[in-house]
Amino acid sequence: MASMTDQQAEARAFLSEEMIAEFKAAFDMFDADGGGDISTKELGTVMRMLGQNPTKEELDAIIEEVDEDGSGTIDFEEFLVMMVRQMKEDAKGKSEEELANCFRIFDKNADGFIDIEELGEILRATGEHVTEEDIEDLMKDSDKNNDGRIDFDEFLKMMEGVQ
């Protein structure tokens, strides 16, 4: 086996032994000739089998990134890097979806913004002792375009600091 790149070592560190074994089993099913690589065509099938759902565009972009030598094939280490990337993307998408749901709940009047009254309600609902000054400070810090309310992008930025 060729020496691992930093990316490949990172990918292995991110995954449990069980996951690596599961990915290897799926990979091997499509490595028909046992040569240690699969064609880019088979890649989508393998990823779907492992619960990933890349679009055609995502697949093309992934393949372009991963198939550095342009051989049209991907070896197992390249495959691991790609799967980890995809898993992280999916996780990011999920947390953004959860935050969108929170935003909708916090945006009581459904105008697409969280105003200072709504922000105050949210903070008081946590049970923490919150002063008007605390609420105003958070609004000031979060309201990047200074329109007196928090839009969804500002909310995402605000929540990045929380997680």
UniProtKB/Swiss-Prot annotation:
Q: Which residues carry this modification: Blocked amino end (Ala)?
A: A2
Where, in this chain's numbering, is Ca(2+) 4 bound?
D143, N145, D147, R149, E154
The protein's GO terms of the molecular function aspect are: calcium ion binding
Concerning Pfam families, the annotation shows: EF-hand_7
Q: Which UniProt keywords apply?
A: Calcium, Metal-binding, Muscle protein, Repeat
**Annotated Ca(2+) 3 binding sites:** D107, N109, D111, E118
Enumerate the spans annotated as EF-hand domain: 18-53, 54-89, 94-129, 130-163
Q: Which branch of life, at top level?
A: Eukaryota
Give residues annotated as binding Ca(2+) 1.
D31, D33, D37, E42
State the Gene3D superfamilies in the record.
Answer: EF-hand
Enumerate the InterPro entries for this protein. CALM/Myosin/TropC-like (IPR050230), EF-hand-dom_pair (IPR011992), EF_Hand_1_Ca_BS (IPR018247), EF_hand_dom (IPR002048)
The protein's matches in SUPFAM superfamilies, at most eight in alphabetical order, are given as:
EF-hand (SSF47473)
Biological-process GO terms, alphabetical:
skeletal muscle contraction
Q: Where does Ca(2+) 2 bind?
A: D67, D69, S71, T73, E78
Keyword Cytoplasm among record annotations: no
Q: List the disulfide bonds.
A: none
Q: What is one term from the GO cellular component aspect held by the record? A: troponin complex
Further information in the entry reads:
Skeletal muscle troponin C binds four calcium ions.
Task: Please give the PANTHER family that the UniProt record associates with this protein.
Answer: MYOSIN LIGHT CHAIN 1, 3, TROPONIN C2, FAST SKELETAL TYPE
Described function: Troponin is the central regulatory protein of striated muscle contraction. Tn consists of three components: Tn-I which is the inhibitor of actomyosin ATPase, Tn-T which contains the binding site for tropomyosin and Tn-C. The binding of calcium to Tn-C abolishes the inhibitory action of Tn on actin filaments.
Protein family (similarity comment): Belongs to the troponin C family.
Q: What is this protein called?
A: Troponin C, skeletal muscle
Question: Per the UniProt entry, what species is this protein from, by scientific name?
Answer: Gallus gallus (Chicken)
Q: What is the lineage of its organism?
A: Eukaryota, Metazoa, Chordata, Craniata, Vertebrata
